[in-house]
Each structure stands twice: as structure tokens, then as C-alpha cells.
Amino acid sequence: MGIMTIDGRKVEFTDEKNVLTVIRKAGINIPTLCYHSEVSTFGACRLCTVEDDRGRTFASCSEEPRDGMVIYTNSGRIKKYRKLIVELLLAAHCRDCTTCVKSGECVLQELAHRLGVHNIRFENTREIHEIDTSSPALVRDPNKCILCGDCVRACEELQGIGALGFAFRGTEAMVMPAFNKKLAETNCVNCGQCRVFCPTGAISIKTHMDEAWEAIADPEVRVVAQIAPAVRVAVGDHYGMTKGRSVMGKIVNALHRMGFDEVYDTSFSADLTVMEETAEFLKRIEKGEHLPLLTSCCPAWVKFITDQYKDYIPNLSTCRSPQGMLSAVIKEYFRDPENAKGKKTIMVSVMPCTAKKAEAIRPNSFTKGEQDTDIVITTTELIRMIDNFGIDFATLDPEACDMPFGFGSGGGVIFGVTGGVTEAVLRRLTKNHTKEAMREISECGIRGEDGIKEVTVPYNGMDVKICVASGLANARIVMDWVKNGEKEYHLIEVMACRRGCIMGGGQPTRAGDRTKAARAKGLYNADNTMIIKKSDENPLVLELYDGLLKGREHELLHNDFY
């Protein structure tokens, strides 16, 4: 423990890793463009520069706190310095702020307002670079890049992919894929974490809102939406509501008002996933083949395996993702003339995930050669559509989802958080339906924010070894353990994004630690209020197995990755 003096106030510190953290602990929101606590310190933007009592200036993000330090965060010299930095950044930056997708959420734009940068004294030095729209999920605009390196570090350190890097030097420096390839030509898995970390509009979501509006406007089309579990705990943040609060009912109301004919809950098909994946898992355990079973809900993880661990493709569950299952079932349901009523069905999926856009157009996710999910919009796009329509979201009354695919169990709802798939499978395996049994499963070690969690649970006289990983860098560690024979598991669950879908690449950005924890808590709270906890107790799921799915489970609910 030590004591620093910050702007004349004594501030204690303990294990804070840098001066910046201590300053923020003291209640001073010092500006940064390149600092994120989850990745390595880069120290490139210099906006967090402070001054000490000897007149020395330094970047507070890369300086360790020392007992007795005297720091000034807003001296006249420092204020001029920060303002100059922003001016220089803007001199080489695209200034089409009114039409930029990041407008209103851009950190650079916010800092320009905050620091009083109303004029730029320097000549515009920027070069015009080609915008990369090759990816099915993301758009890369080098004209808006400020070389903060956030995307590079997120891709390399959190995801272990390294699709982006720095090229050239000095004033010619740029962030780009190796050899200036298009993003779609790289090993990018479409997870969108680069977009989450990007403070400007240099990396953004490839939007499909116009396609959704076009479908809604067509009187010959029935527009059906499905809403993923993680979406419901992220939308409310944008409208000033309690962080992590589930606003599913309001989302349903908003979609109905915008013109969606039917609105269903993806937690319903998460229950289908639990049913199918559990059956597949038990079959593999019995035969002792293709273990460990690798979950296949996350398309970024699936692409990671199919690209980089090809020998383990047979280990992937053949189950479609919940998005894929529900889209296939809904399309089949409306093929019945009695249900179709002469209209073509367009399936719109509302997801927290940018990689779902890539999954939707993946040929092996089609049914009989036809695309099941026609349009994927992210949570961020949904918010823009709600705002575009002029809906006062906070005042909406909640509405229930439509039937027969509008209800999921608690096990389906928690799919949105890391460990949720495993917990739902364990609920399915247990014959004990009591609250105590559900609580015991939740406390076995599969919950929490740790990037890698290992648990062993007894089942039918054997110890089932399970690993839960979130973040592809952690997934790589786990797969290398397995590949090298260092560890053995029966089941491995992976979500590409840290903490799971609640922090997906399509979610609203700039979520602090409190927001991250609140989103997970929001899904667990939703689970707590549900009467049905187990997927195999969902009456709508059981009815579907006795009806439309009878004898067609493999056709509609499974695929292969070869």
C-alpha cells in the first residue's frame, strides 16, 4: 500500500498496475484512446499524460504508482498538450462525422467536444484509402483509423488470431491485414472484437438494416424475427435503463410496432440445442468416439476450429446453432400452406454476434440448399432501427413473444453467458428436478468470468471432465492441451467472446466492468424467475418433437462442417 497526491488530494493505492488506474480510482476520468485493462498497455495516444511535481510529463498508463508521488492531471500545460494531440489526430482523420456509423459513440469525437477542439489549425494531411467491405460481418475503413492499436491487441491477445497488424513506419504507418489482404482473405473469424475495441468508425458492423426495412415494407412477405438471449440484457443500457435489466417484452413490442409479423425467442431453439447436443454427447460417451465433444453454437469458434484445428473437425457437435435450428424450423413451419397463407417468409435474426452474419450464408447451414436465416441484424442495429422508427423505448409496455416458438426454459436463456450451454446440458442430464439440484449445478464451477474453467461431475458411475473457455486465445490454450495430450476432457464449451455472447461483437460498445457483470446477472435473474429450468421440460419443445420434427431431427437440426 502507498499514498499518492493527485491534484492536491491524498489517494491510497494497493495493487493498481499503473498511475492511470489510481487516478480513475480517485474519481478523475482521465481521457484515453488506446488503454484497455483487458489487453497490454500500448501507450500510443499519450492522452493520459500527466505532470509530476518536478515538471516531468509521462503517460500515466505505462507508469507504475510509487509511494509519495505528486501528480497533476489538469495543469495548464497538460490541457494544452491533450488538446494539441486531438487536433493532430483530427488533421489526419476523416471528418464525415454526420454520416459516420460511430457518430455519437466515437471516443475521438467525444474528446474533441470535451477538450474544446472547435478549430483545427493544421492542414488536412490524410490520404484516401479504399474501404474494405469484403467481410460478411465487418467493414474496415482505414480513413478513420487513428493507429491506437486497440484492434490489433484485441485480435492478437484476446482472440489469438492476429488478423490485423501494423504496416510501414512513421507517417506512412497503417493498420491492415498482412500483405494488405482483404479481411475476408485472412484468418479473421468475424467475432467483431476488433470493432468492440475500436474507438472510432475504423471498424464497424456490416449493416443489414435496409434489407430488413425492405422486407417489412413488402406486403407479400411475412417477416419473422428471433431474438437471442444476450440481446435482452443489452438494449436497455442505451435507453438509460438499469444496466443488465432484461427488456425482452419491450423488444417484442418494438418489433411488432416496426412491422414484424411474428417475434420468437431463440432461447426456445437453445432448448432444442440442449436436447440434441446432450443426446449426441451421451452417444459419443457410450461409443468412446470423437471425444472431447466440442460445442458448435458459436460460429467464430467453429471457423477457428475448421481453419486451425482441422483434425478436430469430427469432434465438433453436428448440432446447428440455436439461430440455425430456429430458422430451419420456422421456414419448415411456414411451408405448410395453412400456416403460410400465401406469403413468403423472411427470417430475421437479432443477435449479439457479428459472426452470425457469416454463419447465415454458410452453405452447410442451409436446408435442402436454401438459406434459412435471410437477414441477421445485431443488437446495435436493432437499437438504430428502434431509434429510426421514433419509438420511445423506455415507455413501452412489455409484450409476450408469439407462439408456438416464443417460450424457452431457464436453461435456454443462460446460453448468452459463458458456461450457460454446459449448465443447461447438466440440467438435462440430472434426474433431480429440485431447486437444490439446480443450485448445486450452478455452483459446481461453470459460472464466473474466468477465461478457462474446469469441472468434473459424476454421471452414471463415471467422472465427466468438462472445460469451459471464453475468448479464442483461451480456447487455443485448451485445444493445445488436448492436442499435446496434456489434458483430457469429455466436453469442451467455447464462446469466442470473453464472458460469452453478452459481450459479443454486435453488442453496444464501451461497456465497463459493471455493465459486463450486470449483463450476466440479468440473464441469471431471468433464469431465476422462470418456472421451467430444464430444456426437456419445455412443453412447446416436446410438442415440436411429436409433430413437425418427428423423424426429421437430423435434417432440420444438424449439419456438418466438412
Q: Predicted segment positions?
A:
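Iron-sulfur-associated redox domains of electron-transfer enzymes in respiratory
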Residues: 15-68, 74, 78, 206-562
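Short glycine-rich or small-residue beta-strand-to-loop segments that form or flank ligand, phosphate
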Residues: 7, 138-141, 226, 494-495
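A short N-terminal beta-strand-loop micro-motif at the entrance of redox/enzyme domains
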Residues: 9-15
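Short strand-turn-strand beta-turns centered on an Asx-Gly dipeptide
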Residues: 6-9, 52-54
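Extreme N-terminal starter segment of soluble prokaryotic enzymes
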Residues: 2-3
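Fe-S ferredoxin-like electron-transfer domains
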Residues: 46-190, 196, 203-222
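Charged, low-complexity surface patches
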Residues: 12, 134, 144, 187, ...
